UniProtKB/Swiss-Prot annotation:
The keyword Cytoplasm does not apply. Keywords: Leucine-rich repeat, Repeat. This is F-box/LRR-repeat protein At1g48400. LRR repeats lie at residues 71-97, 125-153, 174-199, 225-251, 327-358, 359-384. It comes from the Eukaryota. Residues 9-57 form the F-box domain.
Length: 487
């Protein structure tokens, strides 16, 4: 019997124009425009696109001459696209410039921005690489409809007046502009709810974003600043955001934090870094004598220990301001900052979830005090158990120097883990090394309220997962309710 032949059907072309317009709006505009050559059916659908995304990085030029002429062709394509769209409503406009700055091209960019602003724009995203440049005019910073604005890299902002009455989300990533213009920009967004900032990528410029945040409406704040060469710009950090519920803050530690009203804050993610190494401030003393000097055990020589310079930074007020949170995430550096730069640890009565990340070069000195300051902690999440052994790791850690073991045995009943209310312990990137297994034994043998332990094996040790599992499952558990699961 002859096989029945079926002709392929173009089912997507049978969809209504409105749906095809939505589909094309999800594609890069260059790809969407190329569909016009498919058939007559697709020829006029570009006019239904309400999301324009122009990315010059998608174009690769073989040499500098082609780069110059090619960049102009890219601009010509953008101009023709706007001409085809006529007076169509535009919801979102994204532009990424890559190639060299040119006065004519800069004028075109300003014209494109004005055009989309006049068409009820909801979102605009502008990015310029170090080779290019986008100057933001004052008249471009006024819109009654814009709800989301992103300015990235070499976008230069110099404004006299800003008014975005509907703007809910603002992202500023390493923009060019001084502190005054930054403040004007924030002040011109009366209903702003989300603010994302990155600063410090230009070491020759003063930090503008992230040193001062004042917004009555702000609910979500993400700050990343990185300028390890300019301690002077970290004398004072000021936050006033009474509606804030989420904070993600990454920066070198500052001399002082002035925080006004973080009472509604629920979750904080902190990655604070010290300006100097702490290797000379905390060390392990592994001998069995009663002194704190490792060197004098070898030859009886006498060493004069010079006093250490105080470490720059004070996070006392910052921690006091976030004491009502329920979830806290800490980087390895933050643990050291808490230890060296906090004069008085607040009590986190509402903290239910604590997540920390370990690093073999960073210590756990603050862990005993931190755990004692979280009386109602329910879930403890630790990414990696390997950390730097110091003379002050305390009873939260199994890596106790030999000299202190007798003292620790006498104070066993006072161990911070025995009074800890943690019911869920989650360990990720577990490698099964001797130090890690000791730490697991320490947790399982001291956390009396523990009910669930979740262990995720490091990808490098997947081949030994059964062996690692067996080692952990045989460890003694002080809690009769404790169940161990490998995830």
């Amino acid at each position: 019997m002859a096989m029945m032949r079926t002709s392929p059907r173009d089912s997507i072309s049978n969809l209504p124009d409105e749906i095809l317009g939505k589909i094309l709006s999800l594609l890069p505009t260059k790809v969407a425009a190329s569909t016009s050559v498919l058939s007559k059916r697709w020829r006029n659908l570009l006019g239904l696109v309400d999301n324009l995304c122009f990315d010059e990085s998608m174009v690769v030029y073989p040499n500098e001459e082609e780069e110059t002429s090619g960049s102009l062709r890219f601009c010509d394509f953008v101009d023709k696209t706007f001409a085809l769209l006529s007076n169509s409503h535009i919801k979102k406009f994204s532009l990424s410039r890559v190639y060299k700055y040119n006065d004519d091209v800069d004028g075109m960019v300003r014209r494109w921005i004005r055009t989309v602003m006049e068409r009820g724009l909801l979102e605009i995203h502008l990015h310029a690489t170090p080779m290019s440049f986008v100057a933001i005019e004052t008249k471009l910073l006024t819109s009654n409809t814009l709800v989301k604005l992103t300015l990235s890299a070499r976008c230069f902002v110099e404004v006299e007046r800003v008014f975005f009455p509907a703007l809910k989300s603002l992202s500023l990533f390493s923009i060019l502009g001084d502190y005054t213009n930054y403040i004007r920009l924030i002040d011109g967004c009366p209903v702003l709810e989300e603010l994302y900032m990155r600063d410090g990528d230009y070491p020759f410029l003063r930090l503008t974003c992230g040193t001062n945040v004042e917004s009555a409406s702000l609910k979500r704040l993400v700050i990343f600043t990185h300028n390890p060469n300019e301690m002077i710009w970290h004398e004072l950090i000021y936050f006033e955001a009474p509606s804030l519920v989420y904070l993600d803050y990454s920066s070198y530690v500052s001399a002082k934090y002035d925080v006004v009203d973080f009472d509604l804050l629920v979750e904080a993610r902190l990655s604070l870094r010290l300006w100097v190494s702490t290797n000379d401030y905390d060390y392990s003393d592994d001998d069995d004598d009663d002194d704190d000097d490792d060197d004098d055990d070898d030859d009886g020589d006498y060493y004069i220990v010079e006093p250490k310079a105080p470490i720059f930074g004070d996070v006392t007020e910052l921690l006091a301001a976030i004491r009502n949170i329920t979830t806290l995430h800490l980087s390895p550096d933050s643990l050291e900052v808490f230890h060296f730069c906090c004069k008085s640890m607040p009590v986190f009565n509402n903290l239910l979830n604590l997540s920390i990340e370990s690093n073999k070069d960073k210590g756990w000195q603050v862990m005993p005090l931190l755990l004692k300051s979280c009386p109602n902690l329910h879930t403890l999440v630790i990414k990696g158990l390997v950390h730097r052994v110091t003379s002050r790791c305390g009873d939260a850690c199994a890596c106790i120097p030999k000299k202190q073991r007798k003292i620790v045995q006498k104070e066993e009943a006072l161990c911070c883990l025995r009074t800890c209310q943690v019911k869920v312990l989650q360990i990720s990137e577990y490698g099964g090394y001797f130090q890690e297994l000791k730490q697991m034994r320490h947790f399982l043998g001291k956390l009396e309220c523990l009910e669930t332990v979740k262990v995720g094996v490091h990808a490098e040790n997947n081949n030994n997962s059964e062996f690692l599992r067996a080692n952990v499952l045989t460890l003694p558990r002080v809690s009769a309710k404790c169940n161990v699961h490998f995830i």
